[in-house]
Amino acid sequence: MASQGTKRSYEQMETGGERQNATEIRASVGRMVGGIGRFYIQMCTELKLSDYEGRLIQNSITIERMVLSAFDERRNKYLEEHPSAGKDPKKTGGPIYRRRDGKWVRELILYDKEEIRRIWRQANNGEDATAGLTHLMIWHSNLNDATYQRTRALVRTGMDPRMCSLMQGSTLPRRSGAAGAAVKGVGTMVMELIRMIKRGINDRNFWRGENGRRTRIAYERMCNILKGKFQTAAQRAMMDQVRESRNPGNAEIEDLIFLARSALILRGSVAHKSCLPACVYGLAVASGYDFEREGYSLVGIDPFRLLQNSQVFSLIRPNENPAHKSQLVWMACHSAAFEDLRVSSFIRGARVVPRGQLSTRGVQIASNENMETMDSSTLELRSRYWAIRTRSGGNTNQQRASAGQISVQPTFSVQRNLPFERATIMAAFTGNTEGRTSDMRTEIIRMMESARPEDVSFQGRGVFELSDEKATNPIVPSFDMSNEGSYFFGDNAEEYDN
């Protein structure tokens, strides 16, 4: 990409740093995950969790959510000003699961946010460590991406539910910063912009006055983030049009939906990071591993290696399949919800099945679920190989656009074709090429028509043995070219509701 020189790596965004060399980046990312680990250990001590209870992913998620809530400035301020019945704005908590007399019991805990902030800062050398918080948000976002479908959200904004592969990061909070923006899919950005434009259409004062000026700046910033994800000149030019519009309205919504559809074939660059649950970092720190000294990367071998050596448990409902629960969490850990199943299966060394065939619900347990029948099992999070995470859409021929599949946004930099139903996608592009963006639309459609499903992406890139930490011997897998690998095919997952 032409602008590569000005880009910070995503580890730099993650750690809020300016340009650093590779060693400094590895050290600062190590410092970040080490801080998460230290915080987790301290929380387990506070809550008197046994070793087994501390390795329970549901407990990890509760603790992560507590610290995110404790640092959510805007929501805290809102809660102070709008006191609601039964909600103490100064407290945070959630369900903690304990093992008692051979059964799992749920205990609702409540903590002062101030106390949680103190423990977090103490674990992070007295700093706020915003990067670590963002890291936890991205882990939750990746878990949501693997667990829920966003059909309803897509339909509400006028998009097609088959565009789900563009929705990475759709549940990330707004305060997730540059690192959060990097992992958002094209569809997520389009949806945020459409919501904003719709508000402007319905509320005359939305773009006016001092507040309106701030709104406008936010709008243009979001447009620029989305523009940066596109890799073809025509798509970027269309984004300039949307950004510069005097009074954004239905024409802009049309343009954005057009761009989102085009991203099914002319894919955008979306970053992928392996963000693991806090308990995994906690286990490593507890065993004496020094993340800062050893260095850490979210896009290399490190997360794979960490998962090879971590034993994490999960609560299992009576009719759930533990292997399926493991697959769900494995995909979340590697940000692979939108990856081709052929690639995921090869790396994992076990068949990764489409979500419609999974006998498992989400990881979190609702407060009204019966604990009597709950069991727990070990999550199998190990892999056969490792591969480098990608931040490109896998477009071929000089980063022009190439084949995409109705639902793939590649996670791993591994050679494969990206099969897609051209007829299905192109059917959405009939007619409307008039108006001020007509030449760009025509150009985009032309590029899409010339894309071939058999083109190979990530030419020559392969997976690596777990013993090959310097990535010296790529193993280039061969895939059945016709077999498409969409995780969301024939889907029956629950909707994501806040």
Swiss-Prot record:
UniProt KW Cytoplasm keyword: no
Motif (Bipartite nuclear localization signal): 198-216
Pfam families in alphabetical order: Flu_NP
Keywords linked to the UniProt accession: Capsid protein, Helical capsid protein, Host nucleus, Host-virus interaction, Ribonucleoprotein, RNA-binding, Viral nucleoprotein, Viral penetration into host nucleus, Virion, Virus entry into host cell
PTM comment, free text: Late in virus-infected cells, may be cleaved from a 56-kDa protein to a 53-kDa protein by a cellular caspase. This cleavage might be a marker for the onset of apoptosis in infected cells or have a specific function in virus host interaction.
GO cellular component: helical viral capsid; host cell; host cell nucleus; ribonucleoprotein complex; viral nucleocapsid
Protein's recorded name: Nucleoprotein
Species: Influenza A virus (strain A/Duck/Australia/749/1980 H1N1)
Organism ancestry: Viruses, Riboviria, Orthornavirae, Negarnaviricota, Polyploviricotina
Name of the gene this protein is made from: NP
